Regions:
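Alpha-solenoid repeat scaffolds
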Residues: 128-129, 140, 149-152, 170, ...
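Charged catalytic carboxylate motif
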Residues: 113, 137, 155, 182, ...
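Elongated alpha-helical scaffolds that mediate protein-protein interactions in large eukaryotic proteins
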Residues: 84-92, 109-113, 121-140, 153-154, ...
């Protein structure tokens, strides 16, 4: 059975989607995107582009969407007769010399024929003949079309969209030729169709290289995008704006976010998240939701002074409501980003953590902590570790709901990256000088896990567990009634003294210092 264009595209991008989900952490996704933009936004951008091509009317693949042209047509400077003639015309590569002659003509009517011819040659192929642009030195003339009347701007933008979608740093060539500044100015155009295409060009630019990302990540572009988001209801414009912001926000020079209105951006992105009904969205709206959540994830992690805005504008309540929606966890990428936003807020101050806990997040964590998706499981364990590092009341919430026995089981079955988050969550319980919590540690197998962590080969895990052990030994000494440290006795029974003595020869200075302190203070007779 033959595979259709749509099926082939869906298969290609479903595969990339699965590859993205297999990545370990959001930080890994961010790091990977520096060299090769593998984020979902990139995948959806490429998919949208290819779908745009296959949706062109057939068999006459040279025609253009009548809806778009109806707006353009009202503002053209050439004759309507020529406009419609070019609209229906078919151009082939065999006509290239004639097309170039028209394109280079000083006569506007002839030049327009050339523009349309080039655009249709680039658009009609799945792998467009971009090389003809550079072999025939046409790029400068195409860019100059951005300064002309709207029908030329439309054709020029379509050409640049196709050129910048190439694989050989074509975007850098367009920028070097002065095209970016002209495209940026078109974001002020009175026609949404022109603004949309200008954004599409910029969207292509920001997905090309790290050099291009850094070049475009500036207040001029950001402020224009923020203004567009604040003034439009056009779904395509919104989609491009949030995709560009998602890609560029992490490349803003020296992280000087005070040069852009971050508060306004947060509120606009939050409104979009709240407005979009996840269970009745089309694919474009879902992509917008993904990008918006990714933006808030980045902001909540890296621009921490704005966390309170997220709590005040209602988006966090909406996110938690969305997380609680039945079967939302099946959309693993979205579920992960939503949890990451919540985790970033919990990682803030006590008031911020308490607000999140008041919304019932702990029940969600318990429900999903045994997920088979290791990336999600690690994120959940990280969130729990932040809660367990908080005030005693919040530690007790985790105890009361029964999360710690589950964490102990996860530690014994999981890989290194998850174990360290579990260790943090368990060891944070020791940092309270309260008999209730410390007795809980002793009576529920957590001390055994801490000792297992000390025996591991991971420096970070050993250090965290040694710190916890010091807290416990101090507690045992303080509560001793006959001079016997019952924590010390338990450790001896587990055969940990030899382990501690051997760790004094560890290459890590801090491990040596901790083990030396433990033996000197609590086992001086050894």
């Amino acid at each position: 059975m033959m595979t259709t264009d749509k099926e082939r595209i869906d298969s290609k991008f479903d595969s990339r989607y699965r590859n993205l989900l297999s990545m370990e952490t959001l930080s890994e996704i961010k790091e990977e995107s520096i060299n090769k933009e593998l984020s979902l936004g990139k995948s959806f951008q490429e998919k949208l582009f290819l779908q745009k091509r296959i949706q062109l009317p057939k068999p006459n693949i040279n025609t253009t969407s009548s809806n778009t042209n109806s707006f353009i047509e009202k503002n053209i400077s050439i004759s309507p007769e020529l406009y419609h003639k070019c609209k229906e015309a078919i151009f082939t590569l065999e006509q290239l010399n004639d097309i170039i002659n028209h394109f280079n003509s000083d006569n506007l009517n002839s030049k327009y024929i050339g523009f349309v011819g080039i655009r249709k040659l680039l658009l009609r192929e799945e792998n467009p003949p971009i090389n003809i642009i550079f072999e025939n030195e046409l790029l400068h003339g195409i860019i100059e079309g951005l300064n002309m009347s709207v029908e030329f701007q439309y054709e020029a933008l379509w050409c640049l969209i196709n050129i910048s979608f190439g694989k050989n740093k074509e975007s850098e060539k367009i920028i070097k030729e002065g095209g970016y500044e002209k495209i940026l100015n078109l974001l002020n155009h009175n026609l949404d169709e022109i603004k949309e295409m200008a954004l599409w060009c910029i969207d292509n630019f920001v997905h090309e290289s790290l050099k291009t990302k850094k070049l475009l990540a500036n207040k001029s572009l950001f402020n224009k995008l923020i203004t567009l988001l604040a003034t439009t209801s056009n779904e395509k414009i919104i989609s491009h704006c949030v995709c560009i912001i998602r890609v560029l926000i992490k490349h803003f020079p020296n992280k000087k976010y005070e040069k852009i209105d971050i508060k306004k951006l947060i509120n606009l992105i939050s409104k979009l998240i709240i407005f979009i009904d996840y269970y009745s969205v089309n694919e474009s709206e879902k992509n917008i939701l993904y990008d918006c959540c990714f933006i808030l994830s980045y902001i909540s992690e890296n621009i921490k002074q704005y966390k309170d805005i997220l709590l005040e504008n209602g988006v966090i309540q909406h996110i938690i409501k969305l997380i609680k929606t039945p079967n939302i966890e099946k959309d693993e990428y979205l579920f992960y980003i939503l949890l990451n936003i919540i985790g970033n807020i919990i990682n803030g101050n006590v008031n911020q953590t308490n607000q999140i806990l008041n919304y019932g997040i702990i029940d969600i964590l318990k429900k999903n902590i045994t997920t088979k998706n290791k990336k999600l499981q690690k994120e959940i364990c990280w969130i729990i570790s932040n809660i367990s590092a908080d005030i005693p009341k919040n530690k007790k919430l985790l105890i009361d709901i029964g999360l710690f026995p589950i964490l102990c089981d996860i530690y014994n079955k999981s890989e290194r990256s998850i174990r360290i988050e579990v260790i943090y969550a368990l060891c944070n319980l020791t940092q309270v000088n309260d008999k209730y919590y410390l007795d809980y540690i002793i009576n529920n197998g957590i001390l055994n896990i801490i000792c297992s962590g000390i025996k591991s080969n991971e420096t970070k895990e050993i250090v965290v567990c040694l710190e916890a052990l010091i807290y416990l030994l101090h507690y045992g000494k303080k509560t001793s009634k006959d001079g016997t440290n019952f924590i010390g006795n338990e450790i001896e029974k587990m055969g940990m003294l030899d382990v501690l003595e051997n760790l004094q020869y560890n290459k890590s200075e801090i491990i040596y210092e901790y083990t030396y302190e433990i033996i000197k203070k609590f086992f001086p007779y050894e």
